[in-house]
């Protein structure tokens, strides 16, 4: 029966460590076989055969094999625990990074909406003021036109003045519209730059966190391997 720890460690890219443990076990097995062959030679020279002694020797080999099997299973369980802890830390760091990213993006979006709303409010008030003034001017022009219908020259002069006023009002509206578009584009550009910078910082933080987790995991795995090998060899 293959231990669960050895199967999982093969997926984690650490088969050489298990091979080293198996190699150490093979060396011990070879030593025992060599010592066993020497005992067989000694037994051939000795005319008396101890059958009970051979049975006890076979039981000792089985006990040693069981202990090695238990150590390997414990070694696999330690690797499984380390991998599970690594996975939990990665999930924790990833969730924290995603949460921070969402908060920053929401803040950027909220700021952008507030700035756009502020611009809309300011320029709406200015547009309304100019339009109201223009309507008042037109009303005055109509009233003056009705009163001065018999005075053509004076009416023509007023008409020319009104045309100049209308041209100025239209020019003011055009300037306000162009300024509004320019400010809106500047806000969008600044927010895009801020979003790009935030995304770049988040990528750097994720890379640093991943590197830190990998280093901690490698150190923990090496410590587990040393501990398992020491318990296996000594």
Swiss-Prot record:
GO biological process: cell division; meiotic cell cycle; spermatid development
GO cellular component entries: chromosome; chromosome, centromeric region; lateral element
Source species, domain of life: Eukaryota
Ranges where the record places region Interaction with DNA: 51-56, 86-89
PTM statement from Swiss-Prot or TrEMBL: Phosphorylated.
Coiled-coil features, chain-numbered ranges: 64-221
Region Disordered, annotated ranges: 1-57
Entry text on domains: Composed of a long central coiled coil domain. The N-terminal and C-terminal regions interact with DNA.
Tissues and organs where the protein is expressed, per its UniProt entry: Detected in spermatocytes (at protein level).
Family designation: Belongs to the XLR/SYCP3 family.
Modified-residue entries (Phosphothreonine), positions: 198
One Gene Ontology molecular-function label: DNA binding
Native source organism of the sequence: Mesocricetus auratus
PANTHER family hit by this protein: SYNAPTONEMAL COMPLEX PROTEIN 3, XLR/SCP3/FAM9
Protein name: Synaptonemal complex protein 3
Basic residues: compositionally biased ranges: 1-11
Feature: compositional bias, Basic and acidic residues: 25-35
Function per UniProt: Component of the synaptonemal complexes (SCS), formed between homologous chromosomes during meiotic prophase. Required for centromere pairing during meiosis in male germ cells. Required for normal meiosis during spermatogenesis and male fertility. Plays a lesser role in female fertility. Required for efficient phosphorylation of HORMAD1 and HORMAD2.
InterPro entries: XLR/SYCP3, XLR/SYCP3/FAM9_dom
Localization in the cell: Nucleus; Chromosome; Chromosome, Centromere
Keywords: Cell cycle, Cell division, Centromere, Chromosome, Coiled coil, DNA-binding, Meiosis, Nucleus, Phosphoprotein
List of residues that carry Phosphoserine: 35, 37, 57
Pfam families: Cor1
UniProt-annotated stretches for the region Important for oligomerization and fiber formation: 67-72, 229-234
Broad class of the protein's primary localization: nucleus
Assembly and binders: Component of the lateral elements of synaptonemal complexes. Homotetramer; the tetrameric helix bundles assemble end to end into long homopolimeric fibers that exhibit a transversal striation with a periodicity of about 20 nm (in vitro). Interacts with SYCP2. Forms a complex with EWSR1, PRDM9, REC8 and SYCP1; complex formation is dependent of phosphorylated form of REC8 and requires PRDM9 bound to hotspot DNA; EWSR1 joins PRDM9 with the chromosomal axis through REC8.
Positions of short motif Nuclear localization signal: 86-89
């Amino acid at each position: 029966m293959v231990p669960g720890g050895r199967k999982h460690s093969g997926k984690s890219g650490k088969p050489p460590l298990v091979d080293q443990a198996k190699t150490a076990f093979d060396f011990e097995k070879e030593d025992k076989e060599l010592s066993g062959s020497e005992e067989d030679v000694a037994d051939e020279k000795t005319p008396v055969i101890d059958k009970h002694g051979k049975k006890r020797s076979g039981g000792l080999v089985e006990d040693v094999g069981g202990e090695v099997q238990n150590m390997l299973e414990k070694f696999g369980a330690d690797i499984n625990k380390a991998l599970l802890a690594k996975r939990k830390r990665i999930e924790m760091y990833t969730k924290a990074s995603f949460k921070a990213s969402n908060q920053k993006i929401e803040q950027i979006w909220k700021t952008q909406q507030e700035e756009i709303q502020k611009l809309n409010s300011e320029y709406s008030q200015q547009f309304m003021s100019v339009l109201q003034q223009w309507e008042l001017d037109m009303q005055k022009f109509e009233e003056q036109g009705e009163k001065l219908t018999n005075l053509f020259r004076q009416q023509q002069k007023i008409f020319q003045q009104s045309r100049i006023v209308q041209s100025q009002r239209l020019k003011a509206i055009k300037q306000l519209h162009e300024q509004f578009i320019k400010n809106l584009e500047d806000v969008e550009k600044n927010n895009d730059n801020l979003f790009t910078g935030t995304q770049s910082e988040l990528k750097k933080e994720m890379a640093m966190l991943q590197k830190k987790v990998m280093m901690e995991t490698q150190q923990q795995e090496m410590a587990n391997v040393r501990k398992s090998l020491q318990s296996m060899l000594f």
